[in-house]
A protein has these predicted regions:
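Metal-dependent phosphoesterase signature
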Residues: 45-80
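Substrate-recognition "cap/lid" segment bordering the active-site pocket of phosphatases
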Residues: 99-143, 149-157
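Short, charged, surface-exposed secondary-structure boundary motifs
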Residues: 128-131, 173-181, 199-201
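Active-site neighborhood of HAD-like aspartate-dependent phosphohydrolases
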Residues: 1-58
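Short hydrophobic segments within beta-strands
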Residues: 7-9, 95, 145, 167
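Short acidic-hydrophobic, aromatic-tinged amphipathic segments that line or gate anion-handling sites
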Residues: 118-122, 185-195
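Short, acidic loop-to-helix structural element flanking the phosphoryl-transfer center
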Residues: 67-94, 100-107
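Acidic, Mg2+-coordinating phosphoryl-transfer loop and its flanking beta/alpha structural elements
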Residues: 144-188
């Protein structure tokens, strides 16, 4: 008999990302990091000129971080216990927007924190990837957990029958991002695992 399926994002859902990324930049790179609101495009600035770096340089730095610095990421409060509790009631997979070359390192990173589930890497909107995962698992029910409203919008477009929880566990970022629930893409917006877990269990 098919089980329910939880499809969870990683960065800012299970593990902190923006804060350790910014700390690494400030410590080791000729740039500073200060996120004002949710405008990532102007958050990274040259330390000498104060000018924002070019988009290509942002991507280079992000890739460098994921190549070498993922050990800096730590779990969101309550995430490890909650996701493993959910695994007692459903299958769990991780759908993370990273280059495919980082799949194994993400898997190992999560495993080191006690999160032992299949990892699917993706680039761009998550709707098509969600569709493929659902075709593979054929779950009785499914729920996606993600911190970005646009991925809930893509999920609603491609797999509208699944439940969608907008969760951003990074308190410095959560107040500033577009709310997937308010936008009509997610069924709920809950930013702490303490309160998200009962909601998720009720959906299974």
């Amino acid at each position: 008999m098919a089980r329910p399926l939880i499809i969870s994002d990683c960065d800012e859902v299970l593990l902190h990302m923006i804060v350790p990324f910014g700390e690494w930049l400030d410590e080791t790179q000729p740039v500073s990091f200060k996120l004002i609101g949710n405008d990532f495009s102007t958050a990274i600035r040259d330390k000498q000129s104060g000018e924002p770096v070019e988009p290509a340089e942002i991507w280079r730095l992000l890739n460098l971080f994921f190549d070498n610095e993922m050990h800096r990421q730590s779990p969101i409060v309550g995430a490890v216990g909650a996701i493993n509790t959910l695994a007692q009631h459903a299958d769990v997979v991780i759908l993370t927007n990273l280059h495919d070359k980082h799949n194994e390192s993400r898997r190992a990173q999560l495993l080191a924190h006690g999160i032992d589930f299949p990892v699917f890497t993706n680039q761009g909107p998550k709707g098509p990837a969600l569709q493929a995962i659902l075709e593979k698992y054929q779950p009785s029910k499914a729920v996606i957990i993600d911190d970005l409203a646009q991925h809930h919008g893509s999920a609603k477009e491609h797999v509208p029958h699944i439940d969608r929880l907008h969760l951003c566990g990074e308190p410095t970022l959560a107040p500033h991002i577009t709310c997937g629930f308010e936008a009509g893409h997610a069924h709920a917006r809950i930013d702490t695992w303490e309160h998200a877990l009962p909601w998720l269990l009720s959906r299974l």
